[in-house]
Amino acid sequence: MAKQEQAPGRANDVFALTSFLYGGNADYIEELYAKYEDDPNSVDPQWRDFFAKLGDNADDVKKNAEGPSWTRKNWPIAANGELVSALDGNWAEVEKHVTDKLKGKAAKGEAKGAAGTPLTAEEITQAARDSVRAIMMIRAYRMRGHLHANLDPLGLAEKPNDYNELEPENYGFTPADYNRKIFIDNVLGLEYATVPEMLDILKRTYCGAIGVEFMHISDPAEKAWIQERIEGPDKKVAFTPEGKMAILSKLIEAEGFEQFIDVKYKGTKRFGLDGGESLIPALEQIVKRGGQMGLKEVVLGMAHRGRLNVLSQVMGKPHRAIFHEFKGGSYTPDDVEGSGDVKYHLGASSDREFDGNKVHLSLTANPSHLEIVNPVVMGKARAKQDLLVGRTRDDMVPLSERAKVLPLLLHGDAAFAGQGVVAECLGLSGLKGHRVAGTLHFIINNQIGFTTNPAFSRSSPYPSDVAKMIEAPIFHVNGDDPEAVVFAAKVATEFRMTFHKPVVIDMFCYRRFGHNEGDEPSFTQPLMYKAIRAHKTTVQLYGEKLIAEGLVTQDDIDRMKADWRQKLEGEFEAGQSYKPNKADWLDGAWAGLRTADNADEQRCGKTAVPVKTLKEIGKKLVEVPKDFHVHRTIQRFLDNRAKMMETGEGIDWATAESLAFGSLAVEGHPIRLSGQDVERGTFSQRHTVLYDQENQNRYIPLNNLQKGQAIYEAINSMLSEEAVLGYEYGYSLSDPRALVLWEAQFGDFANGAQVVFDQFISSGERKWLRMSGLVCLLPHGFEGQGPEHSSARLERYLQLCAEDNMQVANVTTPANYFHILRRQMKRDFRKPLIMMTPKSLLRHKRAISTLAELSGESSFHRLLWDDAQYNKDEGIKLQKDAKIRRVVLCSGKVYYDLYEEREKRGIDDVYLLRVEQLYPFPAKALINELSRFRHAEMVWCQEEPKNMGAWSFIDPYLEWVLAHIDAKHQRVRYAGRPAAASPATGLMSKHLAQLAAFLEDALG
């Protein structure tokens, strides 16, 4: 037996000697080693001996202790501030802390034992243990209380099996301990409290009609703020009589509006708010409290549910206008063109005033694609924040300034949990270039998604769980307790205005009718709808509460309802003859702009810049501060650019782009370029942001051109297409005088944002009268790089083109690129521009321009002549027009493939004509050019497969042109790759064989 008794002792000795080998201790040992290198006497003798034998380089030891250069300093944050670590459960440390405090109190005579005598050592130990157990219980409520809160108005939710996790007995308290005052050191706002006093505060705070999730937050200040804001004997949900009447009034308006429409337009789709009426007073509170804290503007985005109610009761849209739309009337004046949209997609704007604070509200128009409006709203808000600060701002605007504009997003529960763009937007929320000082998310959680139960629409307990990834606090609240909902909205607004971080309100409610008013929900949710039919409305429940409090009588409530109904009847009558007299899309920042004239084909604007100005900008583009250490390859890049500016020759793609950006910035147009790796450029061509090779400092030549210039921002975005493109589109809606560009890493990846192209960029102006000057740069070109690095799918964008809705271009020269970028800002209207941009042409010896082509009377050319026609030193001299046997029309990089092949073959009777802008199609210009070659064969050549590229789009247009010029050949022949399922081959040998084949077809 003796041997067996010694074994554990030996095992512990071995563990004591080897525990430092445990991987989790590596950081600690590295820090100890660094301390030893600084001062060997600062560590224990055993460690001193150990380190002395290692003999490592002292500098390496210190670097290892510091960790990699890219690590975030002071992270993760050490949790504190509540006597207990939120994460590590280090209760021994807490006990020591409390014991020391109690000893101090005992010494001062502030803490006494049961007999009124000073505390003995034993009593101090017992009191400290009581304190620790109490704090453990408090922490359990903070962590898990929300699971026990009364959140479901219908009472259908299953109660969680809590294993008595919140019971005092679980923490060692018995009823005999309930009268004893326990030291809790101002946790819950009390220094001493009995167990029942603690439970009263904890149950009211965490297990009532509000459930708060905040213990996942790692910032101690944010956690402490929430605790202090909601915990404590005086922190009940309490409203003045006036406040309660205001809530009741808004509820009556919300419910009465839905019921009125239900009677007047029986069965018509309205996606009513019935069951979620508490949203309306909550939104009022957000605007009111925000206004008190400095809020100037709210940009709203929401789905269809409750939209008409928000428009009328919160935004102040006249009811007569809504009733006019219900009877099929247009929402725009008769003289305004547009295809229109259904009434529950429309936007609006208004000013509301509370307590002398004026707040501007704007609701963003959106499609039925759920949640896709979120990034658009964030982008709009960011632009409005930038406009408040001004065009000459620094690139770091304080969040306290940004907080003056609030993006407020309303979500459905199934969509918030289901749509990936939600997570993308949360991912954007804290990033440089995309921060908006916190979005307020309000989930209308009616516990159903069309016909699908939550158990089948998400894998997590709450729809809001995705927001935990960015440590947003989440306020769950019962929608049948309007006071709790308004209180949650108030606290959420205060948190956002204080910390400039996103926050979520998850309002549990229900949908009184089907998904739309013509739908029967009992087919799929019989039990839920049985409960709903028997359930009183929110107005009834709240009215009964206020009657019980003696604040109102039933007659008062009936009178309020009758007055509201009478007002709506008056508005309904007015709606019969209502005529919209003002379309608001050219107000504010858009003043001075107009809608484009379809008939006006020559719309290039004045885009040329004097050579002197270009040279001044060019000089600044290649200058860096004296003490700035440029990478030697970048220095060569700058030297080459300096040479271009000096000679005025050889201007490449990236230089033309920088000159376009620089000239616009000098003229007062901010430039915002966003996308993956845009600072440097995917192909290492741009380099508009330079990095010091010794200290990583940044220098941006485009922001150092001259005093008073507008800002240039290049934003390396997160690895997302959908949210980032939606964000940039939103930005372009709010600031028409900024050139906003989004660049795909490769054009192939742009279809990750297809919804934004389809629902907003191509159709937003026709549906909602919202212009955008957004530029999309999509690298495109077949160079043997395989199916995912070749095609931006040009055909997709061309298929979307109609009614002068956007521009699609595939330009071939730096000069034309320069002019098309400047053209975006130099006309008095805005249109989106989809640009196929080059890859190999970025460094192609022929794809260069001169300063003369950017200045003087130069402008953008929708068609470009054959270089052999007007460049004297070309290897080929073309025949006269009458002798040309074939005209090969093309667009983009394939022109250079054709040109070089023609030169190699010595062909002089084939003319190459470039269509630089594919839409709006340059029909008149093409008639003028092709009239020269009436007898020639016409060929369309493209590098894309036949079922892709521009062929299907351009063929009918070209036939129309040929008919107009009475051409000998009335049909255009196709030359290009054959139709294919995949855009491009991944085999270089096959790529080259295909290229040779279609060049032969075009030129042979």
UniProtKB/Swiss-Prot annotation:
Catalytic activities: N(6)-[(R)-lipoyl]-L-lysyl-[protein] + 2-oxoglutarate + H(+) = N(6)-[(R)-S(8)-succinyldihydrolipoyl]-L-lysyl-[protein] + CO2
Signal peptide feature range: none
GO biological process terms on file: glycolytic process; tricarboxylic acid cycle
GO molecular function per UniProt: oxoglutarate dehydrogenase (succinyl-transferring) activity; thiamine pyrophosphate binding
Keyword list, A-Z: Glycolysis, Oxidoreductase, Thiamine pyrophosphate
Stored InterPro entries: 2-oxogl_dehyd_N (IPR032106), 2oxoglutarate_DH_E1 (IPR011603), 2oxoglutarate_DH_E1_bac (IPR023784), DH_E1 (IPR001017), KGD_C_sf (IPR042179), ODO-1/KGD_C (IPR031717), THDP-binding (IPR029061), Transketolase-like_Pyr-bd (IPR005475)
UniProt enzyme class: oxidoreductase
GO cellular component entries: cytosol; oxoglutarate dehydrogenase complex
Cofactor dependency: thiamine diphosphate
Keyword Oxidoreductase included in the entry's annotation: yes
Listed EC numbers: 1.2.4.2
Alphabetized Gene3D superfamilies for the sequence: 3.40.50.12470, 3.40.50.970, Multifunctional 2-oxoglutarate metabolism enzyme, C-terminal domain (3.40.50.11610), TPP helical domain (1.10.287.1150)
Quaternary context: Homodimer. Part of the 2-oxoglutarate dehydrogenase (OGDH) complex composed of E1 (2-oxoglutarate dehydrogenase), E2 (dihydrolipoamide succinyltransferase) and E3 (dihydrolipoamide dehydrogenase); the complex contains multiple copies of the three enzymatic components (E1, E2 and E3).
PANTHER family: 2-OXOADIPATE DEHYDROGENASE COMPLEX COMPONENT E1, 2-OXOGLUTARATE DEHYDROGENASE
Family the entry assigns: Belongs to the alpha-ketoglutarate dehydrogenase family.
Functional description taken from the UniProt entry: E1 component of the 2-oxoglutarate dehydrogenase (OGDH) complex which catalyzes the decarboxylation of 2-oxoglutarate, the first step in the conversion of 2-oxoglutarate to succinyl-CoA and CO(2).
Identification of the protein by name: 2-oxoglutarate dehydrogenase E1 component
Gene: sucA
